[in-house]
């Protein structure tokens, strides 16, 4: 009995001495919970403010804000074409850049006839190196370029391990995904700075959020574009230039064509037209956005999840996409 009493007294003394530490830990826990809760609430408020509230009012006058002409690279299909059409629907004249002259002529005529705007084309293969940029610079030098959309990009044929990627494809990813955006900005930015207005939209990818296995070179190139855009915004915001890093997740383009699963999830994987309509409405509002409401939800989950969980999910998804793509080519 004496032993029980002694243990009870010892327990009370220890509990009393630890009480202040327990209270401190409780305060830390309460502070952490409150901080995380406020962050989540603010993130969802930002999502609503960005993707839903602007749609209730009138559309922004992009010509007045930025200028009369927009340049869109990789503009003959997918997000690039849809983005060009959306800008044209708002009255901007469009200069389309791509490597296929026949497709460029068709798209330019469609846009001009549908939206009653001026269009121009520049034939350029961004994978061919530095020599293409002098003709582009000459073609654009007398234009009031208000918006540049860096959309041109190269994707993997399907998700695969780095050593399975051909050397030619790797060079294309570097030249097109990284060099093209950087040099196109170098071409148009001086004119924007001189006029003290302009917007640069660079299309990155949701795969830049965290290391993405089986898309290693592609996701790294898109991470470059994201950081490049954010740094430019800090450099040139004071000069009247708006720079946006656009971070889409999957959109129903030719890049996702082999996957029947992705094309079934239309609310997660919008069409290029739907995506571009939403994305253009964020121009001038958000410097870094996914451009589409369901992609913003995916981005929030990606931000909060640990890296190991992202990698695990990416491996499962990319293995499935590779298997489906290979079965289509078999």
Curated annotation (Swiss-Prot):
Signal peptide: none annotated. Interacts with STYXL1. Belongs to the short-chain dehydrogenases/reductases (SDR) family. 17-beta-HSD 3 subfamily. GO terms for cellular component: intermediate filament cytoskeleton; mitochondrion. Residues 2-82 are annotated as: Required for mitochondria translocation. This is Inactive hydroxysteroid dehydrogenase-like protein 1. The keyword Ion transport does not apply. NADP(+) binds at residues 74-80, 125, 222. Transmembrane segments: none annotated. The keyword Acetylation applies. Keywords: Acetylation, Mitochondrion, NADP. It comes from the Eukaryota. It is found in: Mitochondrion.
